[in-house]
């Protein structure tokens, strides 16, 4: 079955900024559609979105990217067979001709890549995860729920970008979601009792002003306890430090605590948390260019927790290969829009698996109602997903999609729990 038409349009994401939506239409009029997200704290090496500049939408319009899809990309891909996603993605990479997809825009290329996958699944009358993986059993992901937001995701004084709860002790995804929602509501009550702000950040988590970064962990533990769960048994904690956002000239500047730490001191700062709290995952613990710091961190706590590279690797095989060779981190965050095609996403995930690294499927802070990443988490069996807190429909859409997938699979659905985190001693 061949591609007959490709249509793109400008739509809005969860922050009210434009993004690209694409419909891929086949000869039999089957349609596949996808929308792409956008990040706030972005790695320096990410594939580049194409934005219009000027005054329209404060410079963030995507009409140029839309035009490239409707002309160059459409003209190139018409009559391509829908079954060979690798060939289609490579044709777009070649057409773009830049390393960072900056000519056509990673937002244009990715929207087409995802829409092609959806069109192929719809043609087969299969859900996307099943179209991408014809397996017997499917692994549902353990959710990493960002319930306190700081850093670039919130207007508060918390330096660390995300404090997450991880309901790895739940027996199923459905129950994990319930654990998370109950803790979220109890956290709101805890914050209200302390006269703290309960407005939410970009990813649906609360964004209170706190006297220290560590206080975020303490209020979460209080909420877990109040909800009737045991921290370290039912629910664990994950951190996304996004440390590149507060790293400058070799120093980690924790403004909320009036501290400036060198790499070794910041490693000790994080290691102290791991020692004292049920933390099982730390993402972007060190700056994306502080390879020495990453080496120190991996040696110190890499056998106790999952150390996830996000800004460090930007879902790119070239950078992951360097990390594997240097023996730093033990996990990679997967954001499809950092690399710009589904084919390259699968390639980097295979490289991670082959090296014994885990992969964590992830949303971006600027999201849409598109639920593709939920299917990708199940199709790849990566076992973990980051898709925000327990509020905002752009986040809940992914969780609700996973609920439907688990129900659809019945006995074929496996919830891995702590087994998804294979670096814990």
Curated annotation (Swiss-Prot):
Pfam family, one: Enolase_C
InterPro entries in alphabetical order: Enolase, Enolase-like_C_sf, Enolase-like_N, Enolase_C, Enolase_CS, Enolase_N
Main subcellular location of this protein, as a coarse class: cytoplasm
Xref: SMART domains: Enolase_C (SM01192), Enolase_N (SM01193)
Requisite cofactors: Mg(2+)
Cofactor remark: Binds a second Mg(2+) ion via substrate during catalysis.
Gene Ontology CC: one annotated term: cell surface
A molecular function (GO) term: phosphopyruvate hydratase activity
Pathway: Carbohydrate degradation; glycolysis; pyruvate from D-glyceraldehyde 3-phosphate: step 4/5
Binding site for (2R)-2-phosphoglycerate: 161, 335, 364-365, 386
Protein EC: 4.2.1.11
Compartments where located: Cytoplasm; Secreted; Cell surface
Sorted UniProt keywords: Cytoplasm, Glycolysis, Lyase, Magnesium, Metal-binding, Secreted
GO BP annotations listed: glycolytic process
Location of the active site: 203, 335
Functional summary from the UniProt entry: Catalyzes the reversible conversion of 2-phosphoglycerate (2-PG) into phosphoenolpyruvate (PEP). It is essential for the degradation of carbohydrates via glycolysis.
Subunit structure: Component of the RNA degradosome, a multiprotein complex involved in RNA processing and mRNA degradation.
Similarity comment text for this entry: Belongs to the enolase family.
NCBIfam families given in the database record: eno
Identification of the protein by name: Enolase
Organism annotation: Ruthia magnifica subsp. Calyptogena magnifica
Gene: eno
